[in-house]
From Swiss-Prot:
Binds 1 zinc ion per subunit. Keywords: Metal-binding, Ribonucleoprotein, Ribosomal protein, RNA-binding, rRNA-binding, Zinc. InterPro entries: Ribosomal_bL28/bL31-like_sf (IPR034704), Ribosomal_bL31 (IPR002150), Ribosomal_bL31_A (IPR027491), Ribosomal_bL31_sf (IPR042105). This is Large ribosomal subunit protein bL31. Its cofactor is Zn(2+). Part of the 50S ribosomal subunit. Zn(2+) binds at C16, C18, C36, C39. It holds the Pfam family Ribosomal_L31. It comes from the Bacteria. It comes from Desulfosudis oleivorans (strain DSM 6200 / JCM 39069 / Hxd3).
Length: 73
């Protein structure tokens, strides 16, 4: 086996987009994460609603002109 080929493993600071910081073991010195247990809906008990109705309406308006052209031919 080759000697000393393993990366250096040390304590790293993980920073969430919400501002929370916590320490984990990693080969990197710092880690940026988008979501953590302090802001994730499963852990906080708060549900975030996604505006799917608005997206569907925007899609229908965008492609309505194609349907009109198709039925006009």
């Amino acid at each position: 086996m080759k000697q000393e080929i393993h990366p250096e493993y040390h304590q790293a600071t993980a920073r969430c987009a919400c501002g929370n910081e916590f320490t984990v073991g990693s080969t990197k010195e710092s880690i940026k994460v988008e979501i953590c247990s302090q802001c994730h809906p499963f852990f906080t008990g708060k549900q975030k609603l996604v505006d799917t109705a608005g997206r569907i309406e925007r899609f229908r308006r965008k492609y309505a002109k194609f349907e009109q052209q198709k039925s006009g031919k």
